[in-house]
């Protein structure tokens, strides 16, 4: 049990996919202008990453590795991710049309979010079993959502502040996410590798 909690904590905080591995920066910058959109995108991405981690583990261990089809890994993982995103998009459109509208183009772009593919490929590289792979995907997705929410909150506060014209918009966002990355770097001693 301790091992699972440690894996979840380390993937969410210490080895964060956005701030340590630099995966998923595009949606982090694009959807983080409001807390509602960031929460919706974070939850949708959490579902997709967790589902993709489970599906890619099964695909790798039941089809690709036994038949020596490793050269099809990236292509097959992208197809699995696209199917998971389509399922998520249909569910969000049906359950919450307002959230579907607020996410806009970023919802179908989860398919091309490098964090989703990166987590699936890292799962294969780490060699985890099924449960640990799903937990790794879920922890990575929680870390992505956490960064998205913190960054959205900081950007909302920054929008109310008087920022010099030279730093308004993207420069302030990049400075903010770099400071957030430094804050998360302080957690690096939390889990021994």
From Swiss-Prot:
- Biological process terms in GO annotation: electron transport chain
Specify where it is mainly localized.
membrane
Question: Which domain of life does the UniProt lineage start with?
Answer: Bacteria
Plastid listed as a keyword: no
Record localization? Cell inner membrane
How does the protein's chain sit in the membrane according to the entry? Multi-pass membrane protein
GO CC terms in record: plasma membrane
Presence of the UniProt keyword tRNA processing in the record: no
- Give the first-level EC class, as a single word: translocase
* Residue stretches spanning the membrane: 5-25, 39-59, 62-82, 102-122, 134-154, 172-192
Keywords for this protein = Cell inner membrane, Cell membrane, Electron transport, Membrane, Translocase, Transmembrane, Transmembrane helix, Transport
Self-association and partners? The complex is composed of six subunits: RnfA, RnfB, RnfC, RnfD, RnfE and RnfG.
Q: What does this protein do?
A: Part of a membrane-bound complex that couples electron transfer with translocation of ions across the membrane.
Q: Which family does it belong to?
A: Belongs to the NqrDE/RnfAE family.
Q: Which PANTHER family match?
A: INTEGRAL MEMBRANE PROTEIN OF SOXR-REDUCING COMPLEX, ION-TRANSLOCATING OXIDOREDUCTASE COMPLEX SUBUNIT A
- Write down what this protein is called: Ion-translocating oxidoreductase complex subunit A
Q: What species is given as this protein's source?
A: Aromatoleum aromaticum (strain DSM 19018 / LMG 30748 / EbN1) (Azoarcus sp. (strain EbN1))
Name the gene behind this protein.
rnfA
